[in-house]
Swiss-Prot record:
Keywords: Cytoplasm, Hydrolase. It comes from Schizosaccharomyces pombe (strain 972 / ATCC 24843) (Fission yeast). This is Phosphoinositide 3-phosphatase. GO terms for molecular function: phosphatidylinositol-3-phosphate phosphatase activity. The active site is at C342.
Length: 559
């Protein structure tokens, strides 16, 4: 704090949705605190939640506009340009963190019930989750669980840095086959079990094969996939390899030494491309939502619907859910196995593995089960949270605009065009692009939105409520807990995260009653969402439902 210019500024106006509050602004090491003069209440903002800071000035106004990752957009208005500049410079100083171990999680000290609660870090063990599914259990009715085993080939993360140490593979496959076969998959992410359904058919996951222009093949990889599909067999049933990408993208990867399976060598299955776009398209989609909402600090007007629709956000969710439904049908109704991959197997693959399990297994629709699902398919299997969430944005989120106008654009074709060009020019987009941000993408955000869509269609089938999902989305970015820091289980272990930080599940377990669905009725059967009936999860964008879900006499404008 010794290098900051100011820690407290009086006579500041806090503006949100056009409403003004008078008060005093305090800047601490990890939060801004706005103390309201009228009632003494405080508005806290974690610096990790801030995604854009814009210093704006003209002859009449000096303000800082803030965009937060939870879509809380607000403005501080100051009495003088000196106050505005001092706060702007101080925020830059406080937020210019260049190491993950300097984030709030490493300094956060819980209080109350959370402090008394035993740490949740060791409450989830992947081996226990495999055993819950029946892996290694030959006493099941059909004995199929005994066709799987837990291997320690990745102990100390020796073969695949982004996989967990414990993995489930067919019992008929030796570690030697896996050792040689894993080199045929991108980042050594070889096919391995993520879910064994009660009918003994499986969902496995991997990364793309390294086919390349020479059409390389691997006898070990082919043997492993064949063994996976042979763990439970019903004659005449066709197993499925799901490539989440558009086929053109998969083919383009051949030029860089990767690609997709040559099905001449995997004759025991068929392959389907889902056409789900990559992280860059998804980032652009969220950018467009930010653009539609970005004036909600100075204006109470609803967002520009045409810009919301232009984002294609709900179309992307529909594509993901269509893939999830296909996997559910294949495993549960068609009694066949599914192998899922995209490029590296940690983005679209995680979505397409976790969402079907939510539909197939009622355990994952409980609070405890959802913890296990996130731990397994997102944290253990190496979703790159640090990259995708850009937890260390640095000074690139700070911009200055000396041509600031407090009049938001009107919703007309000409003003919309002007608005779009203005957005690009001013870099007010929620995710402006530089080198560090090319890997940023709302993949886990999309997953939570898809979960909400399923909850919206099956409101009584989930033990947790909508607020649970919103708080999980908030803490994805808050950096208050260590769970979502770093890019893999291995990196978190190397940083001793479980020793130096609190687990995200501590937050929810210490407040469990707040997140329970009062209408929950346990339902043991499979649920099947309708991907064509999606709505905007308006609360996640800090909007009332009527601002985003506008009825249409014909078809939904959202799709």
């Amino acid at each position: 704090m010794e290098n900051i210019k100011v820690a407290k500024v009086g006579n500041v106006k806090f503006v949100n949705k056009g409403n003004e509050l008078n008060g005093t602004l305090h800047l601490t090491a990890y939060h801004s605190i706005f103390s309201i003069s009228e009632n003494g209440k405080e508005i806290w903002t974690a610096y990790s939640m801030i995604n854009n800071v814009k210093l704006c000035s003209n002859e009449k106004s000096f303000c800082i506009r803030i965009q937060c990752r939870d879509f809380m957009f607000f403005c501080w208005r100051f009495q003088s340009t000196e106050d505005a500049m001092d706060v702007y410079d101080t925020l830059q100083e406080l937020m210019s963190i260049n190491s993950i171990n300097m984030l709030y999680a490493f300094y956060y000290m819980p209080s109350g019930d959370e402090e008394k609660l035993p740490s949740s870090w060791k409450s989830f063990l992947l081996e226990n989750e495999y055993r819950r599914m029946g892996v290694g259990d030959s006493t099941q009715a059909d004995g199929a669980g005994g066709n799987w085993r837990i291997t320690k080939i990745n102990e100390n993360y020796s073969e695949c840095h982004s996989y967990p140490q414990a993995l489930a593979v067919p019992a008929s496959i030796s570690d030697s086959v896996i050792y040689y076969g894993c080199k045929y998959r991108s980042k050594n992410r070889f096919p391995t079990l993520t879910y064994l359904h009660k009918n003994s058919f499986s969902i496995t996951r991997a990364s793309q094969p390294l086919v390349g222009i020479r059409q390389n093949r691997s006898a070990q990889d082919e043997k492993l996939v064949e063994a996976i599909f042979a763990t439970s067999i019903i004659p005449g049933k066709e197993n499925l390899i799901v490539d989440a990408r558009p086929s053109t993208n998969a083919m383009a990867n051949i030029a860089v030494g990767a690609g997709s399976e040559n099905m001449d060598h995997y004759r025991f299955a068929k392959k389907i491309y889902l056409g789900i776009d990559n992280i860059h398209v998804m980032r652009d989609s969220l950018n467009k939502i930010v653009n539609a909402l970005k004036n909600t600090d100075i204006s109470a007007a609803p967002p520009l619907i045409e810009l919301l629709n232009r984002s294609s956000w709900l179309k992307h969710l529909a594509n993901i859910l269509q893939g999830a439904v296909l996997i559910v049908k294949t495993v549960h109704f068609r009694h066949a196995h599914v192998l899922v991959h995209c490029s590296d197997g940690w983005d679209r693959t995680s979505q397409l593995c976790a969402l079907p399990q939510l539909c197939l297994d009622p355990y994952y629709r409980t609070i405890e089960g959802f913890f296990a699902l996130v731990e397994k398919d997102w944290l253990s299997f190496g979703h790159r949270f640090a990259e995708r969430c850009c937890h260390l944005p640095g000074k690139r989120i700070f911009t200055i605009d000396s041509s600031y106008s407090e009049e938001p654009p009107q919703s007309s074709p000409s003003s919309t065009l002007q608005y779009t060009f203005s957005t690009v020019r001013s870099a007010l987009s929620g995710f402006s692009i530089d080198h560090s941000e090319k890997m940023m993408s709302p993949v886990f955000h999309q997953f939570l939105d898809c979960v909400w869509q399923i909850m919206d269609q099956f409101p009584n089938c989930f033990e947790f409520n909508e607020r649970f999902l919103r708080r999980l989305l908030y803490h994805l970015y808050s950096c208050q807990y260590g769970s979502f820091l770093y890019n893999s289980e291995r990196e978190r272990a190397q940083a001793s995260v479980s020793t130096h930080t609190r687990c995200i599940w501590d937050y929810f377990l210490s407040r469990k009653d707040e997140f329970k669905n009062p209408n929950y009725v346990p339902y043991d059967d499979v649920i099947m969402p309708d991907p064509s009936s999606l709505r905007w999860w308006s609360a996640s964008f800090a909007q009332p439902d009527e601002n985003m879900n506008i009825p249409s006499p014909s078809e939904s404008p959202s799709l």
